[in-house]
Curated annotation (Swiss-Prot):
Cellular component aspect of the GO annotation: membrane
UniProt record similarity statement: Belongs to the oligopeptide OPT transporter (TC 2.A.67.1) family.
Keyword hit for Cytoplasm: no
Tissue: Highly expressed in flowers, and moderately expressed in leaves and stems.
Subcellular location as annotated: Membrane
Keywords carried by this UniProt record: Membrane, Peptide transport, Protein transport, Transmembrane, Transmembrane helix, Transport
Main location: membrane
Domain of life: Eukaryota
Entry function: Involved in the translocation of tetra- and pentapeptides across the cellular membrane in an energy-dependent manner.
Gene Ontology molecular function terms on file: oligopeptide transmembrane transporter activity
Protein name, as recorded: Oligopeptide transporter 1
Any GO BP: protein transport
Disulfide cysteine pairs (residue numbers): none
Length: 755
């Protein structure tokens, strides 16, 4: 595959760039020379630098949206029927509120004594740039805080005490450390037009539809009207899968036909098996776990689905039906941990209560830790994914990155810029590098205190924190290049668990803390630069963007921490399914995988899992496979440049395709891929004009309608225990009850036949 930077060529079409100042247009003789076709079709090349941005409306509506979404998403994250409200909902709701404030608030200006500064509750009409910053607030609130899972497993799963101040510092510092890496790499990941961040185009399209007036041809409708129509349809429809008929979210015909066959149900189940013939009639099935396919370029969809297909329909069946690693003793599709008898692993039998580490005598007298073969292979593929990312970026993009690095030090003229970069440099001051460094230093100091203070409750030593930061710094650029061009992010969660598991085994809290500092600081850095790219497209002053992101991060982290602490300390037996009342929603499904990972990597450790002492040393071969896999495709693309399909093979995407498993199931992948191919292959090529006007608007409207109806369903019906008469369609399943049953002889599992 060639470099992502050579994949698209600039258009030969010349367009005039406009800067609007005080209602008058200054026309610049520039062309829309962005090299990415989707960007040229979506992002305007106009700017009005006089528009107010950090207004009273921005702060009021932005902080309100941030707090509300942080609370709602954190609250629902503990419930069995999870709901995630995206920032699109706030983006829609705050538009009329902003316009209402513009009409009703006083316009009087207030001056600051001794300065030329002044401010007003109402500086003029509500504008698009205010709306963008409000959405950045909301997006930060909606994103959640990964570190709250540590608090949950410590207090609810392990039933241990955790100092409230240590927990608070943990949530804040893991979110803020990424600012440092963002500052270091923004030159490469934001300023370069080849780093186009596909998901941002959904937001750009929606902002334009909500704010811009259009010159329509006869018979055309505005993009805003199109959004409203799709939003209303999505909103009205979601009451069916969300409340009246949940079973249509995952339909598996094979299970309806063979109701008593375990093998048939494994083959047909879209939630617990291979999902042959399964599909969903629910937008949350399409986009809930893998994101909107409308925002992903087709070459990424093809690679992603190809990786999924190879894994689920070739590799996994071979391992399972040859009974490799005693695969048939355990369920086909699960993240649970097991002992040698095929039953759930009893972690309390091997933990020292006082020191909260492994009791080796108890472990040796009990059982080695077993995984489903699917879960074991997912770990192997995650090993290969990171190595493939390093190899791929070095082969295809190493020369470009090295040139950018040298240019950042010596060049004064931006050889790699485009019209958007020129407009930003002409109109706005960039963020000083010391702002990023200051946040990094302060965050690191507090993180060090959280780890070394409080009687070392987090178990992570100072050297572990430094190593976690070094890993995040090393991987931010290569993973950022992949995400900025494919809309897919490779996670560092497994590699960080592996490293600290070898270096500091038997310490579950040290393991999850190291993972969070290493993985989330990188992920947050890419989140920051992705938002900076949105601001780049929408011509938001970079310093205003920085301030909003920083404040929103602190506020969202505080709200998520407070919500988590409140629920854990007030809901009796939260997360403990065996002790909760029948029908209680507080089952914490999202934290179960996190808890199981802490057992695998923290308590047991990779030395007892992935070496000769354990069951799965073969997974280590994926490191070498991932490192070498991009080489033949790189060589072939160089040797046969006329073979265009070779240039589209993206090995890191293929390896990471199943990274959303086991939370994402086969039915989610199939539904996601089908919709993506229809819109970003067929419609993009056959009806490009329609696609340019409506594709990203359609994505935003489907998201918003589904999310808002989901909130209403909860508060109107589920929260008040209002339910429909019992019938089979109310089950939130695919009616494949035998798909979780093992096929091995003699394994007794409740509800399953014994072979």
């Amino acid at each position: 595959m060639t470099s992502v930077f050579d994949e698209h060529k600039p258009s030969d079409d010349s367009h005039e760039s406009k800067i609007v100042i005080n209602g008058e247009e200054e026309v610049l003789e520039e062309e829309n020379d962005n090299p990415i076709e989707e960007v040229r079709l979506t992002v305007p090349i106009t700017d009005d630098p006089t528009l107010p941005v950090l207004t009273f409306r921005t702060w009021t509506l932005g902080l309100f949206s941030c707090i509300l979404l942080a609370f709602v998403n954190q609250f629902f994250g503990f419930r069995s029927n999870q709901l995630w409200v995206s920032s699109v909902a706030a983006q829609i709701v705050t538009l009329p509120l902003g316009k209402l404030m513009a009409k009703t608030l006083p316009t009087k200006k207030f001056g600051f004594p001794g300065t030329n500064w002044s401010w007003s509750f109402n500086p003029g009409p509500f504008n698009m740039k205010e709306h963008v910053l409000i959405t950045i607030f909301a997006n930060t609130g909606a994103g959640g805080v990964y570190a709250t899972s540590i608090i949950t497993i410590v207090k609810a799963f392990y039933n241990r005490q955790l100092n409230v101040a240590a927990a608070m510092l943990l949530t804040q510092t893991t979110q803020l450390l990424g600012y440092g890496w963002a500052g270091i790499f923004r030159k490469f990941l934001v300023d370069s037009p080849y780093m186009w961040w596909p998901s941002n185009l959904v937001q750009v399209s929606l902002f334009r539809a909500l704010h811009e007036k259009e010159d329509l041809q006869k018979g055309q409708q505005t993009r805003f009207r199109f959004f409203i129509i799709v939003f209303c349809v999505s909103f009205a429809y979601y009451i069916i899968p969300g409340y009246l008929f949940p079973s249509i979210s995952a339909i598996s015909f094979v299970c309806w036909i063979w109701k008593s066959s375990v093998t048939a149900q494994i083959v047909g189940s879209g939630l617990k098996g291979l999902g042959i013939g399964s599909f969903g009639l629910d937008w949350s099935t399409v986009a809930g776990f893998l994101g909107s396919p409308l925002a992903v370029p087709f070459f990424a969809i093809a690679n992603f689905f190809g990786g999924f297909f190879i894994f689920l329909y070739i590799v996994l069946p071979i391992f399972y039906w040859t009974n490799a690693y005693d695969a048939q003793k355990f369920p086909f599709y699960t993240s649970h941990t097991f002992d040698q008898t095929g039953h759930t692993y009893n972690i309390t039998r091997i933990l020292n209560e006082k020191n909260f580490d492994i009791n080796l005598d108890a472990y040796n007298g009990y059982s080695k830790l077993y995984l489903s073969v699917m879960f074991a292979l997912l770990y192997g593929l995650s090993f290969g994914s990171l190595c493939a990312t390093i190899s791929h970026v070095a082969l295809y993009d190493g020369k470009f990155i090295w040139g950018m690095w040298k240019k950042a030090k010596t060049a004064t003229k931006d050889k790699y810029g485009d019209v958007h970069s020129r407009l930003m440099k002409k109109n706005y001051q960039s963020v000083p590098q010391w702002w990023f460094i200051a946040v990094l230093v302060i965050s690191f100091a507090f993180a060090l205190y959280a780890c070394e203070g409080f009687d070392k409750q987090l178990q992570l030593p100072w050297w572990g924190l430094i190593l976690a930061c070094a890993i995040a710094l090393f991987f931010t650029l290569p993973i950022g290049v992949i995400q900025a061009t494919t809309n897919q992010q490779m996670g560092l969660n497994v590699i960080t668990e592996l490293i600290i598991g070898y270096l500091y085994p038997g310490k579950p809290l040290a393991n999850v803390a190291f993972k969070t500092y290493g993985y989330i600081s990188m992920s947050q850095a890419l989140y920051f630069v992705g938002d900076f790219k949105l601001g780049h497209y929408m011509k938001i002053p970079p310093r205003s963007m920085f301030i909003v992101q920083l404040v929103a991060t602190v506020v969202a982290s505080t709200v998520c921490f407070g919500t988590t602490w409140w629920l854990i300390t007030s809901v009796e037996n939260i997360c403990n399914v065996d002790l909760l009342p029948v029908g209680s929603p507080w089952t914490c499904p999202g934290d179960e995988v996190f808890y199981n990972a802490s057992i695998i990597w923290g308590v047991i450790g990779p030395g007892r899992m992935f070496t000769k002492e354990g069951i799965y040393p073969g997974m280590n071969w994926f490191f070498l496979i991932g490192l070498l896999a991009p080489v033949p495709f790189w060589y072939l693309s160089k040797k046969f440049p006329e073979k265009k399909w070779l240039k589209q093979i993206h090995v890191p995407l293929i390896f990471s395709a199943v990274s959303a498993m086991p939370q994402a199931k086969a039915v989610h992948y199939w539904s996601w891929a089908i919709v993506g191919v229809v819109f970003n292959y067929y419609i993009f090529r056959r009806f490009k004009t329609w696609w340019a006007r409506h594709n990203y608007i359609l994505s935003a409207a489907l998201d918003a309608g589904t999310a808002i109806m989901g909130v209403l369903i909860f508060f109107a019906f589920q929260n008040n225990d209002i339910s429909l008469p019992d019938w089979w369609g109310l089950e939130n399943s695919d009616h494949c009850p035998l798909a979780h049953c093992p096929l091995a002889k003699g394994v007794v599992v409740e509800g399953c036949p014994v072979f």
